[in-house]
Amino acid sequence: MQGVYPAIVTPFKDGSVDFEGLRKNIDFLIENGVKGVVPVGTTGESPTLTPKEHEKVIEKVVDFVNGRVEVIAGTGSNSTLEALEFSQYAEDVGADRVLLITPYYNKPPQEGLKRHFGEVANSITVPIVLYNVPSRTALNIEPDTIKYLFDEYSNITAIKEANPNLSQVSEILDICNIDVLSGNDELTLPIMSLGGKGVISVIANIAPKEFVQMVEFAEKGKFDKAKEIHYKLFPLMKLMFIETNPIPIKTAMNMLGMPSGELRLPLCEMAQSNKLKLQNALNTLGLLK
């Protein structure tokens, strides 16, 4: 894996998934050079989708993409059985890869993680992207566990690393050849400078062209040019997490007239003071017309 993979929002309209809006967003992203799209992850509000909605979104995204870029379907769960079933479904409908978050809330030990991911890996043939985000799961995949999984299962090929500890990223890259993708927009360049391959991005939903340019410069070793774009987008990157993701990105998309719609409870609308900060940042970047 290499490049920019937006973690796409799930647009809603009148309480249901807005599939036409989803199609428009996907076309916009592909036209602006992304390497793939990642539906039903954190940004896609997977915790508040019903199982049928979750599967339908994956199916529709595969259909809308129609082979133009990769589809990396979010299929993780804190239930190994559910993760396995979602992953098998994603493979059956044509997803290119699956994204598996570490089990949250039940906080398994490292041995439990090995068995959890191993069960899913043995049940499918498509490549698996591990997803480490300790700030949400209260659980870190240790580098030795990542190495074990990469060595043991041929279809575990990449990790979305959202642990902001660059020491951990360095250790992962030092001990195994797994593809490391940043799970934090603002750490994309630092991680790529260590040998990372790109990013699963939030900000790319609204600024895909610029973010793709930044990553392509980094891939070519042109870090001076990449840094210019990084610092240009940095204030907006930080605002994407001024409240819980995906509240800021969906708010920004609504401001820009992009299909996004409401959030599902328990997520709710952004505080007015933060909306003003977001609006100012979008104006500064010339994104608001």
UniProtKB/Swiss-Prot annotation:
Gene coding for it: dapA
EC primary class: lyase
The record's GO CC annotations read: cytoplasm
One term of GO molecular function: 2-dehydro-3-deoxy-phosphogluconate aldolase activity
Q: What is this protein called?
A: 4-hydroxy-tetrahydrodipicolinate synthase
Protein species of origin: Methanococcus vannielii (strain ATCC 35089 / DSM 1224 / JCM 13029 / OCM 148 / SB)
Q: What are the site positions for Part of a proton relay during catalysis?
A: 42, 105
Annotated S-S bridges: none
Q: What does the function comment of this entry state? A: Catalyzes the condensation of (S)-aspartate-beta-semialdehyde [(S)-ASA] and pyruvate to 4-hydroxy-tetrahydrodipicolinate (HTPA).
Q: Quote the InterPro entries the UniProt record gives.
A: Aldolase_TIM, DapA, DapA-like, Schiff_base-form_aldolases_AS, Schiff_base-form_aldolases_CS
Extract the HAMAP family matched here.
DapA
| UniProt keyword Protein transport, yes or no | no
Query: Which UniProt keywords are present, listed alphabetically?
Result: Amino-acid biosynthesis, Cytoplasm, Diaminopimelate biosynthesis, Lyase, Lysine biosynthesis, Schiff base
